[in-house]
Amino acid sequence: FGGFFGSRLMSNIREDKGYTYGIHSYFQNHVHASAWMISTEAGRDVCAATITEVIKEMELLRNELVDMEELNLVRNYMIGSLLGDLDGPFQLIGRWKNYVLNGLDENYFYKSIETIKSVTPQELQRLANTYLQPDDFYELVVI
């Protein structure tokens, strides 16, 4: 959605609209709960328009199937990111610490890779309809 340069948010809000230099989305995972964050720096004059565009992108995911070209691009990015997290002893121990703190076993990594490889556009749309409910989100704007 917004984790890399070719993402939907970057394409729309940076490249098409020019509202910001960068916009990102990521999960903030904790032991008992997680939060999905979207962050950017945009001018005061385009702040409301930026939020509107983020909501439009959520609606697109809820109402239209992701095409296979985009899905494969995101799959490759996600698998590359997971593998990059294993590049060195500090990254490895950080990943294992996360597994231990969250009660996950050693197969979690392999299950994650398999899920990324096998998820379908229909499953993504179902998940978007379950979790991307704009009325359930909080907006924090700092000026």
Residue ranges and their predicted role:
Residues 1-7:
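His/Glu-based metal-binding/catalytic segments typifying zinc-dependent metallopeptidases
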Residues 8-9, 127:
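Short, hydrophobic/aromatic alpha-helical segments in well-folded domains
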Residues 10-63, 68-119, 135-143:
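M16 family metallopeptidases and their MPP-like homologs
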Residues 120-129:
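Low-complexity, intrinsically disordered Gly/Pro/Thr-rich segments
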Residues 132:
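Extracellular/periplasmic catalytic domains that process cell-envelope and extracellular macromolecules
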